[in-house]
A protein has these predicted regions:
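Hydrophobic packing and interface segments
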Residues: 1-225
Length: 225
């Protein structure tokens, strides 16, 4: 009944569901179209152009399967809820990795491209893990920051700023490693265009399980309401 609470919940839905969904959808479609174009430039022909689209379809189906494994019990703790959501996300990624192998071989016959896809999937899961590590109250970084609040607001501001800066290091290193590995795995040493295609297909692989990832991100606003 509090208008401020209602406005806060509406803001959560607008920002964390509608806004984030539009942002991630734009990234998803952009990566598919970019890889579509790079497939033609790299000399793969229509096979290289259709692969990112098929990979996206495969990822959507695997995301749907992963949602069926997100199960909780009555009066479950927050830790068990997060574990259940994590299980569904990782399972969808594993299914996508397994399905991408025969798909890539049938369409292109190039295991290097599959290695780039796998690199993107692993990198996406790793970024998700480190994001949870630095933001969840079940891990030490946020627990230490909460303990710092006992000494005053200054320590919270300083500690929060430093923690936020440190939290980006892992993601930066993972993205850099994924770009480098996927570039050379797809044949970037011999052909620059094929290396760029490897980076693009790795991005599609990283975003292929966007369906369940976006559903997991929407858990917060839904739970608040």
């Amino acid at each position: 009944r509090n208008p401020a609470t209602i406005a806060d919940n509406v803001g959560d839905n607008v920002g964390d569901v509608a806004g984030m969904g539009a942002d991630l959808y734009e990234s998803y479609v952009g990566s598919i179209l970019a890889t579509f174009s790079l497939g033609a430039c790299a000399g793969y022909g229509w096979e290289g152009m259709i692969l990112p689209i098929l990979l996206a379809v495969c990822g959507i189906l695997c995301s749907i399967v992963g949602t069926f494994f997100v199960k909780t019990e009555e009066n479950a703790t927050q830790k068990s809820l997060l574990r259940s959501l994590r299980t569904g996300t990782y399972l969808a990624a594993a299914l996508s990795a397994a399905a991408a192998a025969p798909l890539t071989w049938f369409v292109l016959g190039d295991w290097g491209v599959y290695a780039a896809i796998l690199c993107g999937l692993v990198g996406g899961c790793a970024i998700g893990y480190f994001t949870e590590y630095y933001t969840s109250d079940t891990y030490k970084p946020t627990q230490k920051l909460a303990a710092a609040a006992e000494t005053g607001s200054a320590t919270v501001i300083i500690g929060g700023l430093s923690l936020g800066m440190m939290s980006t290091i892992a993601s930066i290193l993972i993205v850099a490693a994924a770009i480098l590995i996927s570039f050379y795995a797809a044949g970037g040493g011999a052909s620059f265009d094929r290396g760029l295609y490897g980076i693009g297909i790795a991005g599609v692989g990283m975003l292929s399980t966007l369906g369940i990832t976006l559903a997991t991100d929407a858990y917060g606003p839904v739970a608040d309401n």
